[in-house]
Amino acid sequence: MEVLREKVEEEEEAEREEAAEWAEWARMEKMMRPVEVRKEEITLKQETLRDLEKKLSEIQITVSAELPAFTKDTIDISKLPISYKTNTPKEEHLLQVADNFSRQYSHLCPDRVPLFLHPLNECEVPKFVSTTLRPTLMPYPELYNWDSCAQFVSDFLTMVPLPDPLKPPSHLYSSTTVLKYQKGNCFDFSTLLCSMLIGSGYDAYCVNGYGSLDLCHMDLTREVCPLTVKPKETIKKEEKVLPKKYTIKPPRDLCSRFEQEQEVKKQQEIRAQEKKRLREEEERLMEAEKAKPDALHGLRVHSWVLVLSGKREVPENFFIDPFTGHSYSTQDEHFLGIESLWNHKNYWINMQDCWNCCKDLIFDLGDPVRWEYMLLGTDKSQLSLTEEDDSGINDEDDVENLGKEDEDKSFDMPHSWVEQIEISPEAFETRCPNGKKVIQYKRAKLEKWAPYLNSNGLVSRLTTYEDLQCTNILEIKEWYQNREDMLELKHINKTTDLKTDYFKPGHPQALRVHSYKSMQPEMDRVIEFYETARVDGLMKREETPRTMTEYYQGRPDFLSYRHASFGPRVKKLTLSSAESNPRPIVKITERFFRNPAKPAEEDVAERVFLVAEERIQLRYHCREDHITASKREFLRRTEVDSKGNKIIMTPDMCISFEVEPMEHTKKLLYQYEAMMHLKREEKLSRHQVWESELEVLEILKLREEEEAAHTLTISIYDTKRNEKSKEYREAMERMMHEEHLRQVETQLDYLAPFLAQLPPGEKLTCWQAVRLKDECLSDFKQRLINKANLIQARFEKETQELQKKQQWYQENQVTLTPEDEDLYLSYCSQAMFRIRILEQRLNRHKELAPLKYLALEEKLYKDPRLGELQKIFA
């Protein structure tokens, strides 16, 4: 505190000198002016003060009444541990140190606000803020990084505003209480998030400072939703191709240079006007979106988390707003100033000026000039002393005394009084309060749900709007989880009415993306597949009412592309479909990758089947260092004419262009065999196109069934939702219960009441054994009869009551209301159910009673206590 004290003393001395000069000048001026002027001046000052009071009274601090309240009265403290209700001696000592530190700070910095050191907890016990932090590493891998931790805290808790936006809260609850009630203010959010980040290995601190209105109220209506920001596309630099020496020179440009210059000027003027229009439109939108001036700007208290660089490979310092879970630069304008910050080891006061928000702050906590610490012996090392300062500490005795003095002043932070922070798997999965949360962004609305809360697996929906009032919808994005059809994302463009479904690997049809406007067949659609999961290597299929294009990869025949053009369907009386009445194929175009096993002049690059014109066109791959490729065209004719005569292959039926005609001359037989092979290939290609049409119909039918059922998958390890596992567990419990009842029944001693009538230790005679057996069987028989009579009595009672109710209904049927009739029908249904159950129990009892009687008789014969019976029946 020495540097702080010297600085404050210098400022006080300068203020006293300035005040003395001002008082002397005012006294001289007062003596020189007349009395009337001084009276008028006093009147003006009073009017100015009244005007100022009036303006200040108009400033109202409003707190939204819709936000939920979270006070100590709503917290059950009866089950909290003793550490929440009392302080240890070490904690009491720490509070005394904090009070002393606060008194010195208030004395040396009277213009600064009081420090936020030891607010009350939920049990009305003062606790130091550093001991409220409980560093905890969560058992979930998803919460190991700062971004997932911040997003979890933002989703899990509900924001509660500060009671007074100009002051820190009087209470700071434990993280366990905040997690239990899922509510808290910014300080509660920061405490929980900081505890999780420190437990994960980050150098994190809770900050007490000042924020903007949007930051304090969690108002994101002027923020762009992160999900709408498209990633920047990396622009690949085109490599300049060096011109070859013997390239063909381009033809001379005969266009007028003057006309070209005039056209360039005209285009520049058009671009300038368009740029001006866009700039004016942007300024107009910015003016409309501009926030209204805040009367309390710079005074609103807020708490957030500071993460310093170094640990966990953090490259630079940054802020985390716990309300939203978003990260911000330390230069961001939303953060207007810092009063203090703390972690689980120490407490620091910011001694730097925040006139330029937090942009000029240096977060070197080891610098006591910029950051005044409360406790010695922290993990932040002090700055190294300069040579001038170090020259005065050369004496070894002084160094030893200095070390002893520091040791005496050091004080270790007590352990946290908060219990271990725990998040149950159910709470971690549910995340949002009641399983749902809605966040309003600029021209966007984000809705979140817990998994399995919606029957269709919907977990998130992003709706983007055209205007700031969020009335005209542009597009909707819906994210799904645990879908049996592997649906992951559904994108709906309201402008074009285009729907796009994205799937994870594992769909029965290996779907990756399905874009469509209508689920009706033979409409515009694009279907992408996971080609590695398909036998044919199909990557993408594009369909229009008249065409179908398919892209392949990794096929053994090197097919890469197939395009089919269709003609109008022939009209029939019955309903037409792709299976019963397929569309006539007009043209099929197929392209192939290069087959290195064949020479280029024999490897087909493209073949076109002109079905309507009965022609087949072939184009082969180019040789290396060639710019043209060989081509052939076959005139496909029927093998016999109208009279049944066989047509002979003629040279005019094959038109060819050879790059090297002297190397290979194809004979007529080769051309005939090639044409026969192409006919077979054409037939096969037409069949594959027909199969593709049928596959599209099958996919559409399957997608309609999947959307109607929207079945969700449940892990075998999820015993809470897995019905099969639940049924098996209940069956095992039922079997164990029945086994327990059987064991109890076998251990039941029927002879005990009758043996108690005899003197203890007396040996039974033959006559006594027979008498005990008969009495026991007679008693058991009577119990069976009584049980049957009881069931019969209940059966007759229920039957009589039902008959009375039916008779009452017959008598009052005309005057009954519909509600009375519903009650009567409900009663009859329940009564019939009870009567049926009693009848079944009575019949079952009648069947089992003789068996139970015989089982008891056999058990008595084998009882060693009635051994005389065995001698009689031996």
UniProtKB/Swiss-Prot annotation:
Residues 386-400 have a biased composition (Acidic residues). Residues 1-67, 257-297, 688-711, 781-807 form a coiled coil. Its main location: other. Residues 386-410 are annotated as: Disordered. InterPro entries: CEPT76/DRC7_peptidase-like_dom, DRC7/lobo, DRC7_C, MORN_DRC7, Papain-like_cys_pep_sf. It comes from the Eukaryota. Residues 401-410 have a biased composition (Basic and acidic residues). GO terms for biological process: flagellated sperm motility; sperm axoneme assembly; spermatogenesis. It holds the Pfam family CEPT76_peptidase. Component of the nexin-dynein regulatory complex (N-DRC). Interacts with TCTE1/DRC5. Interacts with DRC3 and GAS8/DRC4. Component of the nexin-dynein regulatory complex (N-DRC) a key regulator of ciliary/flagellar motility which maintains the alignment and integrity of the distal axoneme and regulates microtubule sliding in motile axonemes. Involved in the regulation of flagellar motility. Essential for male fertility, sperm head morphogenesis and sperm flagellum formation. This is Dynein regulatory complex subunit 7. It comes from Homo sapiens (Human).
